[in-house]
Amino acid sequence: MIPYAHKKAYKTGANLRSSNRLEVYLKNCCVACMSAKQNACRQADVVLVTNIDVPNPYKAILEGNEIKIIKADFDDFNFGGNYMWALAFYKLCALKHVLIETNYGYYAYLDSDVYVQSDFENIWKECDSHIMMYDICHSLQVENYRHFLAEIKSFRGEDCCITHCGGEFFAAKKEDAVMFMSECQQVYAQMTKADFKTTHGDEFIISLAAVKFNVKNAGAYIYRFWTGSRYNPQVLFVGFFPAISAMMNVSIFTSVLSSGLLIIYLILLKFKST
């Protein structure tokens, strides 16, 4: 399913400031749903879950491609409109509604700005043993991850390097999804009671909930591509180059800095076709 909420006074992500926000998101929803139906889920139902009456031409496009539309109020996980990523929390609200109102064996939700290009059958098989979530693979030298962990510490009162799960992907069999949702609701209740505010949206809640379950990284099936004009790559601590000698000649040059650190430069001189 693709969850999407629209409320004029509510903040969305920092990535979109367009005045025609509704139109942009509905186009994204159509692409996400249609790609899932055509490429991945021919034997499964694809659903747009939303709190609005979908206008034409988008409603006609979705229904014309056998995509279901479920209307569900934004009546849970709602922190109010003046909250960073306020609308992102609707994903959890939508999941709660479909778990109550439908009876499928497996459930998955994805962000609206995705393109699905392969079958989900192997994902469903994985869900027999695990909840599948996306580890965004931030290390401690990434400022965003350090800030995320600082919020976790402030909320829990202890240091813990939990996995930062991305909000763009979740998949589980129904019984696991129901238990996961219950844990998410407990985190939400604790946040509300303590008037605790996070700047990391739904990812804060799902990452805390994931600690309690047998979660497997879905990184083999999904990858987050940052396509903005500015991107800060992570520093790689270890590079592994299997079978490198079969593909290219490698010259290794070493130099010792004044600090005594050894730096190894791999210069790829010649590529050999195999």
Question: Predicted regions: what is each one?
Answer:
Residues 120-187:
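Conserved catalytic core of nucleotide-sugar-dependent glycosyltransferases
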Residues 75-80, 139-141, 223-228:
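A short acidic, often aromatic-flanked loop/helix-cap motif at beta-alpha or helix-coil junctions
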Residues 160-248:
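Catalytic core and acceptor-binding pocket of nucleotide-sugar-dependent glycosyltransferases
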Residues 91-142:
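GT-A fold catalytic core of metal-dependent nucleotide-sugar glycosyltransferases
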Residues 23-26, 30-33, 77-108, 122, ...:
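A conserved donor-nucleotide-binding helix/loop in the catalytic core
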